[in-house]
């Protein structure tokens, strides 16, 4: 009788050991499978229209998300589109709106009164900045948006630039305070936040000379980006620049940023970088096979730390 009890206990122990090893093996297997099968890959695409091709792109390429840049869009249609997307895909993805895309910036407000960042800057009120960002976030969240490319942290642009209305102020201290409150409001409301444009948006061209040695000297108002980092922004959007590794290292090492770097819209394959979430322009939307080839050709070089950060971010959705 004692032997039977002992044997039963041993078998029970072996059973629990087996279950533990099996579960952990599956976790490892699934993690490896995610990399091998590209279940979470650092590519996002700009969406200019909704159709079945979009669903195929999301499901067949396993991109991590979309930025909705559809023209003539209102909040009701946005709600319907996102519901259709969620019904037809079986995984979490980033669904974003871009602050300075003119056709979607103000779709969740009275079109007769556009609350641009420049207006908030004129009010010089941190409480007002937080209030407006909270209202935006709650409205966007209610229709299924989970990420916003905002705010713009730069304090300078060309007078003719479309960014002019989206910049809080040329006063670095004021801009930093408003940026902090805006990011905090988005985060408090549960939106993933991507601030931009690092290191600068210059003269309507996202270009910086590769021969400049002193990185600090050309960073446009670094303290405004530090305000975004202090408010725990998830992502920083980096301009298309040569020698971009210097700026990546400066963000992580000097500015102590621990989040994710994301590119601006990519129109040329040469601008794809392995340490960032690559945002492909809507041009890539036309050919799903070309898109798959681009991802397959670049995924092997993708930074594993980036993949890990991105996976954690998407799991929170």
What are these regions (language model features)?
Residues 57-178, 202-213, 241-246, 263-298:
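Enzymes and membrane/adaptor proteins characterized by extended Gly/Ser/Thr/Asp/Glu-rich
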């Amino acid at each position: 009788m004692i032997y039977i009890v002992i044997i039963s206990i041993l078998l029970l122990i072996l059973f629990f050991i087996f279950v533990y090893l099996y579960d952990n093996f599956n976790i490892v297997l699934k993690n490896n499978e995610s990399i091998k099968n590209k279940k979470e890959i650092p590519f996002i695409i700009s969406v200019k229209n909704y159709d079945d091709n979009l669903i195929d792109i999301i499901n067949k390429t396993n991109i991590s998300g979309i930025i909705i840049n559809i023209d003539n869009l209102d909040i009701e249609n946005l709600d319907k589109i996102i519901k259709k997307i969620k019904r037809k895909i079986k995984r979490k993805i980033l669904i974003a709106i871009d602050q300075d895309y003119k056709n979607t910036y103000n779709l969740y407000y009275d079109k007769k009164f556009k609350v641009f960042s420049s207006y908030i800057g004129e009010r010089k009120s941190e409480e007002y900045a937080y209030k407006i960002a909270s209202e935006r976030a709650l409205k966007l969240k209610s229709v299924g948006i989970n990420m916003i490319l905002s705010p713009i942290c730069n304090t300078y642009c060309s007078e003719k630039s479309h960014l002019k209305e989206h910049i809080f102020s040329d006063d670095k201290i004021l801009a930093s305070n408003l940026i902090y409150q805006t990011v905090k409001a988005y985060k408090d409301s549960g939106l993933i936040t991507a601030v931009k444009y690092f290191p600068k948006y210059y003269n309507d061209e996202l270009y910086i000379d590769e021969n400049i040695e002193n990185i600090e000297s050309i960073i446009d108002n670094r303290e405004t980006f530090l305000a975004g980092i202090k408010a725990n922004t998830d992502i920083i959007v980096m301009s298309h620049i040569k020698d971009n590794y210097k700026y990546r290292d400066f963000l992580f090492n000097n500015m102590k940023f621990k989040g994710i770097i994301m590119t601006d819209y990519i129109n040329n394959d040469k601008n794809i970088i392995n340490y960032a979430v690559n945002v492909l322009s809507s041009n890539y939307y036309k050919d799903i096979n070309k898109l798959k080839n681009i991802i397959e050709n670049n995924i092997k070089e993708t930074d594993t730390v980036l993949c890990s950060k991105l996976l954690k971010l998407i799991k929170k959705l």
